[in-house]
């Protein structure tokens, strides 16, 4: 079930504050976050986020096509190891 339209998109307040401050300062260093559930807003475009995948931080550069998606979609949490050929 998707989120109700009247509630609007979710973003952590501390993350939005960091992005706004970063845009004012014109600095482009990665913003470290554990908030995989936050929706990408248009203000995020052009910034780099270090998104936690449970073990390490994955750098995600936000483009226009990513607006409306979640940060966690671009930081995979599982690594597939190929099945062995000889059995």
Swiss-Prot record:
The biological process GO terms on file are: ribosomal small subunit assembly; translation
Signal peptide per UniProt: none
PROSITE patterns tied to this protein: RIBOSOMAL_S19
Q: In which domain of life is the source organism classified?
A: Bacteria
- Kindly list the GO molecular function terms attached to this UniProt entry: rRNA binding; structural constituent of ribosome
The UniProt entry's GO CC annotations, sorted and at most eight, read: cytoplasm; small ribosomal subunit
Keyword Acyltransferase in record: no
Q: Does the keyword Acetylation apply?
A: no
Tell me which PANTHER family the record gives.
RIBOSOMAL PROTEIN S19P FAMILY MEMBER, SMALL RIBOSOMAL SUBUNIT PROTEIN US19M
By sequence similarity, the record places it as follows: Belongs to the universal ribosomal protein uS19 family.
Q: What does this protein do?
A: Protein S19 forms a complex with S13 that binds strongly to the 16S ribosomal RNA.
Indicate what this protein is called per its UniProt record: Small ribosomal subunit protein uS19
* Species name: Mycoplasma pneumoniae (strain ATCC 29342 / M129 / Subtype 1) (Mycoplasmoides pneumoniae)
């Amino acid at each position: 079930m998707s989120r109700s339209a009247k509630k609007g998109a979710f973003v952590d307040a501390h993350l939005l504050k960091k992005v706004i401050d970063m845009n004012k300062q014109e600095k482009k260093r990665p913003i470290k976050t554990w908030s995989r559930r936050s929706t990408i807003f248009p203000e995020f475009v052009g910034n780099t986020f270090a998104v936690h995948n449970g073990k390490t931080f994955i750098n995600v550069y936000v483009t226009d096509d990513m607006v409306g998606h979640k940060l966690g979609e671009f930081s995979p949490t599982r690594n597939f190891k190929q099945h062995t050929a000889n059995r």
